[in-house]
Amino acid sequence: MKVAIIGSRNLYVNDLQKFIPSETTEIVSGGAKGIDACAARYAASNNIKLTVFLPEYNRYGRAAPLKRNLKIIEYADLVIAFWDGKSKGTKNVIDNCKKQNIELIIHIKEK
């Protein structure tokens, strides 16, 4: 199962193990700091394939992170969102998952 781990850049989760399904075969990330970095570390330390979608600023300009997020959620089988309750980017992912009926688990974590 391809699991996208997305979230606010100011959040960190040290033990992702309890949030990630055991049938996970691939972690999908946006390559940013915060939750994305936690996801990359988790994948590396657990020998799980990591796929990173980076924003294409040359192609999309300021909209690049939002375009990247759409690619992530379309690619993944499950999206796990860690949200600080404020991040507009994470909220956008949550809203898009709901609109597209993409399987989504939301964890609201304050900084």
Describe each PLM feature range.
Residues 2, 7-26, 30-111:
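Acidic/glycine-enriched connector segments
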